[in-house]
Amino acid sequence: MWNFKYKNQYLNYVSDLMQDTAVQSMRLLPQHRAGVSCYHHSVLVSYASWRVCDWLGLDARAAARGGLLHDFYLYNWRDAASHPGIRHGSQHPEVALRNARARFSLTWREEDIILSHMFPYTPTKVYRCLESAVVSTMDKLCACLLYTSPS
């Protein structure tokens, strides 16, 4: 994957999540472009959010954990048959939150990060904390970087 400068400190917050079989299954799900899995995108968002929140003096643990689980929807979003009745763009945060609640104990900040990460596309899911705004911004930035970087 990537060579993160502060990998060990970051892993203190997320290693338990990363060892979960459902989180690992995200490696099999495509994300924004070919060759990038939902897992790899989520780790990149999580790490970037953790660094920014740590620098800002915010809850870096919540940013790391919420960032890792922000796309924990567990279906192939490119295959409509794998998620019947779900409008992926607007509803996947709710699916991700439901899946995360079923497997992990979440703080209110982690829940808000997952639920509001698509704002303003989901205009009724406004950030309730700064960590959510950071993760949402890092999600959009990472998606743009993944789309535009050479293969």
What are these regions (language model features)?
Residues 1-79, 85-86:
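Acidic/His-rich, divalent-metal-binding segments that scaffold phosphate/diphosphate chemistry
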Residues 70, 74, 120, 143:
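Active-site micro-motifs of SAM-dependent methyltransferase domains
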Residues 136:
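Cofactor-cradling patches in redox/metallo enzymes
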Residues 25-53, 62-63, 90-124, 130:
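Histidine- and acidic-residue-rich, metal-dependent catalytic cores
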Residues 2, 6-9, 119-124, 142:
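All-alpha prenyltransferase/terpene-synthase fold signal
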Residues 147-151:
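Conserved small/polar residues in nucleotide/adenosyl-binding loops
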